[in-house]
Curated annotation (Swiss-Prot):
It comes from the Eukaryota. This is U-scoloptoxin(10)-Sm3a. Expressed by the venom gland. Its main location: secreted. One of its GO terms (molecular function) is toxin activity. It is found in: Secreted. Coiled coil: none annotated. The keyword Secreted applies. The lineage of its organism: Eukaryota, Metazoa, Ecdysozoa, Arthropoda, Myriapoda. It comes from Scolopendra morsitans.
């Protein structure tokens, strides 16, 4: 009985690892030039406040991820995620969050 439970959870764990490594994530994509340029412009404004710089970086990452599924999330989604906005590219369609979003709709 214990052997069966152990084998079951081992197989389940391995399947999850394989699935996790096979899906593409937003963090795995290289940052587009438009994203880095926009981030640099905002960081220049917050040069004297390092705490705001960290917050700006975090907000940009969050907005980039949100823009992948909703191009009207923020005004500059086409700069943050040109892979998905204004038109979804094959790279965009391979992302896990985009696949999940398309399944729901």
């Amino acid at each position: 009985m214990y052997k069966f439970i152990f084998i079951f959870f081992t197989v389940f764990f391995l399947i999850n690892i394989i699935e996790e490594s096979x899906t593409x994530k937003v963090e795995d994509l290289p940052l587009p030039k438009s994203y880095t340029n926009a981030l640099q412009q905002h960081l220049e404004k917050d040069k004297k406040r390092p705490d705001l710089q960290e917050l700006t970086k975090k907000n940009f990452k969050t907005n980039r991820k949100s823009c992948m599924t909703n191009c009207s999330h923020v005004e500059g989604c086409f700069l943050l995620s040109p892979e998905c906005c204004p038109k979804m590219t094959p790279t965009c369609l391979e992302l896990d969050i985009v696949k999940e979003h398309l399944k729901k709709n």
